[in-house]
Amino acid sequence: MATEKLRAVLDTNVPVAAYLSRNPRSPTKELIDRWRNEEFVQLYSDGTLAELKQKFAEKGIEPLLVDRYIADLLRIGVHVEFDPGDIEPVIPADPDDDLIVACAVAGGATHIVTYDPHFEVLGGEYKGIEVVDGLAFLRLVRGAVS
């Protein structure tokens, strides 16, 4: 019996952490590798993609790595469209984070994956979407494919 793959919106801090980590066994690096192996579905929107490109540039991530990640996201990620008017203000400390939540809701995500403490205001869940950090999500992905 096949089970549905986990569907996640990765906050920009997750892939940025993977690329900045010097640890070859970094959980975020493993998470990105498992996504590339299509062990879970990554959802993105035009807005989250633009923010991702901006954060990669701000953090000085090597352009070739950025290009590969973006190309992979466009190839195997699932693009989510929604009306900007549908973005609910749920993260008062950082309204930009509402874009991540809106993408997750519109895309039928099972999870939002983030290291951002602003998401703590959601209490670990929003409209049935679990909000977890990268390590917790990696454990779920490992369990889903074993």
List each model region and its residues:
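PIN-domain endoribonuclease scaffold, especially VapC-family toxins
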Residues: 33-87
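Acidic, PIN/NYN-like endoribonuclease modules and their adjacent C-terminal/linker elements
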Residues: 110, 117-146
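Short, well-structured N-terminal submotif of metal-dependent ribonuclease cores
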Residues: 1-44
